[in-house]
Amino acid sequence: MKTFTVIGLGRFGTSVATQLFNMGYEVLAIDKNMDKINAIANLVTRAACTDAKDESLLKQLGVKNSDCAIVCIGGDDITDSVLTTLALKDMGVKQVVCKAKDNMHKTVLKKVGADNVIIPEQEAGVKAAIELVSDRLFDIIELSDEYSIVDAVVPNTWIGKSIMELSVRKKYNVNIVAIKSNN
């Protein structure tokens, strides 16, 4: 079973931790605020109140054995999230995903070794704007800065033509991974 460690239990971290647990994964939730630990204790596999910047404490909790650690530490001071990310990478955690507050924070997290960095407010804003102006897009899943999966209605001019005829890869740099029809 895949194991996750979620560090920082604000709205985003709590949502990630509980969703992963509800999907059947093993989740260790960490925060330095005991009230947040008490609130989530029955909603995840384990919960611990500790300073995530301290590598020795993380090792005692077995964080090193997690398949993925998600750093969701918020606030204006990026120091805690950067130092926590560094500690996780130094310990050898396989995958470290971080929440950033802005592009500068994202750049710093990438430089200290984060495997993936998301900016939830930015991603939600982009998705909302696209959905508001397009009646042809149903869903967008950002996989990385360069790749997304998009569920969309094709233009009428594409109907009845083969993928080869359309040359979508050449013209639009798009790979079609699935086709859903009304039939």
Give the location of each predicted region:
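Residue-level detector of flexible, active-site-proximal loop/helix-junction positions
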Residues: 54, 124, 147, 170, ...
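Conserved beta-strand segments of the P-loop GTPase G domain that flank and frequently precede/overlap
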Residues: 71-72, 153, 179
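Short amphipathic beta-strand starts and helix->beta connectors
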Residues: 133-137, 181-183
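Cytosolic Rossmann-like ligand/nucleotide-binding regulatory domains
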Residues: 7, 30, 158-183
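Cytosolic ligand/metal-binding cores
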Residues: 4, 12, 16-28, 32-134
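Extended boundary segments
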Residues: 136-168
